[in-house]
Design a protein with these regions (language model features):
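Small-residue-enriched, tightly packed secondary-structure blocks
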Residues: 36-193
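Hydrophobic alpha-helical membrane-embedded or membrane-associated segments
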Residues: 19-22, 70
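Sec/Tat signal peptide C-region and signal peptidase I cleavage site
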Residues: 29-36
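Bacterial N-terminal signal peptides that target proteins for export
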Residues: 3-20, 29
């Protein structure tokens, strides 16, 4: 009588080979992440993301005009293959000027596969929320501050009169605001640039 097992050495070897090949295919996507962007490169990307935000989201200019501070993290790359992770670098703008640089890191587990790029804009509407963010050593969305995430879809307008939250967030891609996304668990940490 012969007993067969589900995990033979050949199957385990094939699994490792498959994971290795997928990692090799995905690695070029993150080559720019491994090389941290310069302050100038971040500033250029932030300007592009802000312009796209103003053009794609009706009411965006009002939000920006009333903001105490704006955190812009452009080109956040998210990769998932069972385990997922994302990374991006951006700038905090106060009074129309960049005052600090930040990165964001998040991880997740579950059914996910693929690569996605997105832009994150977090608008601090109250000075106390901005101060708490700037004073933190590593600020987590949903833990250190609650973010009202606007995800009404591309072409939608945002009513700034009825939205009274200290921190408002937007996630958008190439086609406008993205829906069904979250900032929960995303960590934002100040960079030295």
């Amino acid at each position: 009588m012969q007993i067969t097992t589900l995990f033979t050495s050949k199957r385990i070897l094939n699994l490792f080979a498959t994971v290795f090949i997928i990692a090799l295919l995905i690695a070029p996507t993150f080559s720019h992440v491994a090389q941290a962007a310069t302050a100038k490169e971040i500033d250029v990307s932030v300007d592009v993301a802000l312009d796209r935000f103003k053009n794609d989201v009706k009411g965006a200019s009002e939000f920006l005009a009333n903001a105490k501070g704006v955190l812009v993290i452009p080109n956040v790359i998210r990769v998932g293959f069972g385990l997922g992770g994302e990374y991006g670098e951006g700038a905090l703008i106060v009074g129309g000027k960049t005052v600090d640089y930040y990165n964001t890191v998040a991880g997740s587990f579950g059914f996910q596969i693929g690569v996605q790029s997105k832009n994150i804009i977090i608008i601090f509407m109250e000075e106390t929320a901005l101060t708490k963010f700037r004073d933190s050593l590593g600020w987590r969305a949903g833990v250190d501050g609650s973010v009202a995430l606007i995800d009404q879809g591309a072409g939608s307008s945002v009513d700034t009169d009825n939205l009274q939250h200290p921190i408002v967030g937007f996630i958008f891609g190439l086609k406008g605001l993205m829906v069904n996304l979250s900032l929960e668990g995303s960590k934002f940490t100040k960079l030295i640039k």
